[in-house]
């Protein structure tokens, strides 16, 4: 077994100009590391699994900024020096080799890239976590947002909550998998490679773990965490699992396309985000783990990967932005991440738009605006009527919080309740002044664009 890299050596023109150079530099660096790892492994004459484990220790040590190091020190190391570093850590203990998966392509080994480079290299395909967008099941992204992400549009407004989820998941991944192994008796097989589908080359997968079950069954393990607020994990009740995780794991099984992999176990551990300090605390009780098996469904795998390949060839390769979704709020949120808001650049010159091109669009906008105004008027009238009638009923109830509406025979037709409901609010301005660090961690800024269309009345000649 050898280290492999099959990243594209030439960067396609459809990628955004701001990331093309960085992509090229990163790809070259990964190829260089791959070659050096193979040369050093040959020198040590260690098995792939043992060399991989020890070389990973070397890479992590030389990449750790807390030790005053940086990854450039590893890159400057010769194969001979790397071999010496690995041999110095060898204690005669052997580690298992990876499993060969002949029906998929190894893109590269994620164990020997930084998190920053890993995020950059995700531009080379559609991953499992992207699949829910293609299947219309994502509450957080749209086709337009996925297009911006894959071609490499620079992020204008970072999503702090998404970054928090990623950091938490990465930090707790081994804990979740290890807890599952203790519960089930499963054995974790070493795996850290990014894979690419043979049939659909723009579809990629980076499984969290390959597990050997006590029955001899080989499965994928996908670790998840969820903040357990008052123990209300609604999406995980009664054996249910969030739909986006189902598409993600189904896509993984499709990319691997191996008859030995019969299913994927989705394993979720409730956690608490420690407010200060950035540490993540998981439950100590393994029974708190939610787990659900997703068996192979080759028809669904095909449906997902066909949609991903079609998206890539239609939009990414052609540099064509998809149409907005039917969710205007989500469209706006996603677009603000990648497209600078006009209010952020007050110095921009006034633009001229073609009347012939935009008149029809503006007329449709005006009609929609008029319909909305009429609906708002009706809503306001209905609300006033409702409130007036409610006040008459409340007056009849006097100071009671509950009343029965009975007929002459005593039969109850309605039960009316009028209770006080308290809502907590945070004084954000005061919080920002008193505890700026906490505000920075949990606060966010929203932008509102004031849009209007006014007809211009032509002057009489």
Give the positions of each predicted feature.
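Accessory terminal regions of nucleic-acid processing enzymes
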Residues: 1-461
């Amino acid at each position: 077994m050898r280290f492999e890299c099959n990243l594209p050596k030439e960067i396609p023109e459809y990628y955004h100009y701001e990331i093309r150079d960085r992509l090229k530099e990163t790809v070259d660096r990964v190829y260089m590391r791959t070659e050096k790892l193979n040369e050093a492994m040959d020198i040590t004459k260690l098995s792939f699994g043992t060399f991989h484990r020890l070389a990973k220790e070397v890479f992590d040590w030389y990449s750790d900024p807390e030790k005053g190091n940086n990854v450039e020190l590893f890159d400057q190391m010769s194969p001979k020096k790397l071999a010496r570093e690995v041999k110095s850590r060898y204690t005669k203990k052997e580690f298992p080799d990876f499993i060969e998966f002949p029906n998929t392509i190894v893109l590269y080994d994620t164990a020997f890239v930084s998190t920053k480079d890993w995020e950059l290299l995700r531009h080379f395909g559609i991953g499992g976590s992207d699949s829910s967008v293609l299947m219309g099941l994502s509450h957080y992204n749209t086709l337009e947002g996925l297009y911006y992400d894959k071609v490499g549009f620079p992020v204008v407004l970072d999503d702090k909550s998404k970054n928090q989820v990623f950091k938490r998941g990465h930090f707790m991944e081994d804990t979740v998998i290890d807890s599952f192994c203790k519960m089930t008796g499963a054995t974790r097989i070493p795996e850290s490679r990014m894979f690419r589908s043979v049939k659909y080359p723009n579809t990629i997968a980076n499984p969290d773990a390959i597990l050997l079950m006590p029955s001899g069954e080989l499965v994928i393990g996908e670790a998840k965490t969820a903040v357990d607020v008052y123990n209300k994990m609604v999406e995980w009740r009664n054996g249910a699992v969030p739909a986006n995780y189902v598409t993600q794991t189904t896509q993984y099984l499709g990319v691997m396309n191996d008859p030995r992999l019969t299913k994927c176990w989705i394993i979720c551990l409730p956690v608490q985000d420690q407010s200060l300090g950035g540490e993540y605390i998981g439950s100590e009780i393994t029974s708190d783990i939610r787990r659900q098996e997703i068996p192979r469904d080759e028809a669904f795998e095909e449906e997902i990967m066909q949609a991903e390949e079609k998206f890539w060839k239609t939009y990414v390769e052609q540099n064509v932005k998809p149409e907005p979704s039917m969710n205007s709020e989500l469209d706006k949120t996603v677009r603000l991440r990648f497209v600078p808001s006009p209010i952020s650049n007050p110095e921009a010159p006034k633009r001229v738009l073609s009347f012939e091109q935009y008149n029809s669009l503006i007329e449709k906008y005006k009609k929609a605006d008029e319909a909305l105004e009429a609906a708002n008027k009706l809503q306001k009238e209905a609300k006033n009527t409702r409130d007036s009638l409610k006040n008459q009923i409340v007056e009849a109830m006097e100071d009671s919080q509950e009343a029965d509406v009975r007929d002459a025979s005593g039969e109850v037709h309605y039960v009316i309740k009028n209770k006080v409901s308290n809502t907590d609010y945070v004084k954000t301005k005061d919080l920002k002044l008193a505890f700026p660090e906490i505000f920075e961690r949990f606060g966010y800024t929203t932008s509102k664009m004031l849009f209007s269309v006014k007809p211009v009345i032509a002057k009489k000649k």
